[in-house]
Amino acid sequence: KQKLIRTMFKKVFFSSFFLIFFFSNLNANEVDLNDPYYKIGWKNLENPENTSIIIPDANASIEIIETEIYLDSKENIKKRLDLINEQETNIEDIYEKLIIFDREEYYKINIEYNDAGYITSDRFKNFTSSNLLETMNKRMSDSTSKVSWLIEPSLSENNLSTYAYKIEWLDGDITYEYKSLILGREGYIELTIFLFGDGNELEDFFDYYSGVIKEIASTVKFNETYSYSDYQQDDYVSVNTLTNL
């Protein structure tokens, strides 16, 4: 089912561009295993399968499909950054311990676990999306011009909050961020898709990435006794609430 849904999103989004890119992407699914890029610890690279993988340190898992590959350690993520940036990366600047790539690199998902404690969500229900956007704009750096919602934040009955926003920068750049927060008993898991744009993206573009982040986030499962509903009265409660994240 997961493979069908994710593949469907890809087909819808890219069908109109198929003829243009067909020849240049003819071998997109073929991987040169001798390429240094593919020797840094990628998993699900050979003999790919649909499976569930562990989210490091989170007492949780997430499902991947056979067209996805992943790195699940800061050390291997650092190797990738060193290669693509052609310079040394400080491992202390790397916060995620898991990244998932579509094999054709249509998307990359950073996955980070924060053991901040139990995150209360009561205040979130009293805030409007306008309130939250105002707070976000105040938090943004002086180099930003405007922040606007692509997906207004909401909280599901499964304690999952998905939202997305567009950032217009003073230098003319435009970026998009799609996020899902999955609340657990001792902290939360954050999924992020970060994209560059030019402001001329079509609706299919936004529908595609909205579908991807929501579908993948829905596969996250905390282990027994670690889910949000397993909270006990003497558990540590974070100083942050959902509205602060």
What are these regions (language model features)?
Residues 4-14:
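Bacterial N-terminal signal peptides that target proteins for export
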Residues 12-22:
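Sec-dependent N-terminal signal peptides
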Residues 26-30:
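Boundary at the C-terminal end of the N-terminal hydrophobic targeting segment
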Residues 31-47:
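N-terminal low-complexity, Pro/Thr/Ser-rich intrinsically disordered segments
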Residues 32, 105-110, 146-240:
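Short, well-structured beta-strand
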Residues 42-44, 49-132, 232-245:
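Secretory pathway targeting signatures of secreted, lumenal, and periplasmic proteins
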Residues 128, 132, 136, 209-216:
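Stable alpha-helical elements in mature extracytoplasmic
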Residues 131-153:
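Acidic, glycine-rich loop-and-strand cores that form catalytic or ligand-binding grooves
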